[in-house]
Curated annotation (Swiss-Prot):
It comes from the Eukaryota. Signal peptide: none annotated. This is PHO85 cyclin-5. Belongs to the cyclin family. PCL1,2 subfamily. GO terms for biological process: cell division; negative regulation of macroautophagy; regulation of protein stability. Cyclin partner of the cyclin-dependent kinase (CDK) PHO85. Positively controls degradation of transcription factor GCN4 under favorable growth conditions. The PCL5-PHO85 cyclin-CDK holoenzyme phosphorylates GCN4, which is required for its degradation by the E3 ubiquitin ligase complex SCF(Cdc4). Amino acid starvation reduces PCL5-PHO85-associated GCN4 kinase activity and leads to stabilization of GCN4. Gene3D superfamilies: Cyclin-like.
Amino acid sequence: MDGNHRFTPDSKEFNTVVKSKESSTGRNPYQTPPLEHNGTHHQTNYSRKKTNLAIIISNFLSEISRPLSNGKINNSTHNILKFLNEVLKRSKCSKENAVLATFYFQKIHQSRGVRDESSLPEFSHCSRRIFLCCLILSHKFLNDNTYSMKNWQIISGLHAKDLSLMERWCLGKLNYELAIPYDEFLLWETNTLMKAKLRVGTPANAPVKRPRESDNDYDANSWKQIKSC
């Protein structure tokens, strides 16, 4: 189960984009993920597939984590979908990365005990933060060359130290068991993730409507953040 890793943190392409952005704009010099100059038709099809996948996963995550929402944490499908579209675009993660991260997410949720809820850290209630950590883990597991925490900091807007802390917590909940037989992985994707899609009833090519509204996850430069869940 090999992921298609286009850009690594130390790649020439990544460094070239950073330098070009530094010289061309006074705003945040980092463009993550790096810009690609492919055909418009290819980009449109690729973006549509990623959007459809994000819809399926966001519905699944919200179905699991919505009961954990509170005054500070909103695990609605709409909020999760906005985050997924942005983080998948910036990280250039493959479908396998995203689906495996969703598998990890469900395992972590299933490991939660009702008696332990009061002792769990607040971030564990935020579906976006937990999925981000699962995405980091799946990216490390599937790719020989993976992003550093500094790169994930650029992608997410969270501090590298916070990401490391949350990653270790997720690893503990997974008992450090990241490997899964490929047949079992495909079976889970078909019987669990795709069935969740059917329950929600979202058409595969349904357009994503994004109402313009204020969101605490955006900073002054319109960079997606996950500071407040």
